[in-house]
Amino acid sequence: MAASMTKPISITSLGFYSDRKNIAFSDCISICSGFRHSRPSCLDLVTKSPSNNSRVLPVVSAQISSDYIPDSKFYKVEAIVRPWRIQQVSSALLKIGIRGVTVSDVRGFGAQGGSTERHGGSEFSEDKFVAKVKMEIVVKKDQVESVINTIIEGARTGEIGDGKIFVLPVSDVIRVRTGERGEKAEKMTGDMLSPS
């Protein structure tokens, strides 16, 4: 009975949902033209004045919606960035007091697409994956936004392929050496030479 009550839905190539088989392009234009004066709510864009020979790039700040992120004491911030930006990001994280970072070499592709390598004059593009670096940082809830903004500031070039940041809730943190859990295990104490 439930199957007979549902309406067929088609997804068009433009991503609109409709109970019609086809959507005319003019329908899409009229929908989109209604949004021409709106401002994206997900980004704060402010232009940054150029320093030296650098280009003018807008300052991008990720905004968080309390409904969007599940409530948790700890969060893991995973950032996939360009390998040659890792030093800038790591230094910036140290300046804001973040000392516990795990870094892994990864490969993948997104909007940037894959790359083609040249060896001996021949082109090879077996898997089209691009080398990136994944940074994993577990922080308390009140540190998430500053970590995200620091990563964006350090990793951003303004070009396709700058990377992605993922934020995941973490249910618990356990320090292997002592068995401590929660905030005691997450907290990094002492100087860089003394273990915590």
Curated annotation (Swiss-Prot):
Mg(2+) binds at residue 110. GO terms for molecular function: acetylglutamate kinase regulator activity; ATP binding; magnesium ion binding. PROSITE patterns: PII_GLNB_CTER, PII_GLNB_DOM. InterPro entries: N-reg_PII, N-reg_PII-like_a/b, N-reg_PII/ATP_PRibTrfase_C, N-reg_PII_CS. Keywords: ATP-binding, Chloroplast, Magnesium, Metal-binding, Nucleotide-binding, Plastid, Transcription, Transcription regulation, Transit peptide. Residues 1-61 form a transit peptide. It is found in: Plastid, Chloroplast. Gene3D superfamilies: 3.30.70.120. GO terms for biological process: anthocyanin-containing compound biosynthetic process; regulation of arginine biosynthetic process via ornithine; regulation of fatty acid biosynthetic process; regulation of nitrogen utilization; response to light stimulus; response to sucrose. GO terms for cellular component: chloroplast; chloroplast thylakoid; cytosol; plastid. Its main location: plastid. SMART domains: P-II. Homodimer. Interacts with NAGK. Interaction with NAGK is dependent of MgATP and inhibited by 2-oxoglutarate, arginine, glutamate, citrate, and oxaloacetate. Participates in sensing carbon and organic nitrogen status and regulates some steps of primary carbon and nitrogen metabolism. Required for nitrite uptake in chloroplasts and regulates arginine biosynthesis through interaction with acetylglutamate kinase (NAGK) in chloroplasts. Regulates fatty acids synthesis in chloroplasts by interacting with the acetyl-CoA carboxylase complex and inhibiting acetyl-CoA carboxylase (ACCase) activity. This is Nitrogen regulatory protein P-II homolog. It comes from Arabidopsis thaliana (Mouse-ear cress).
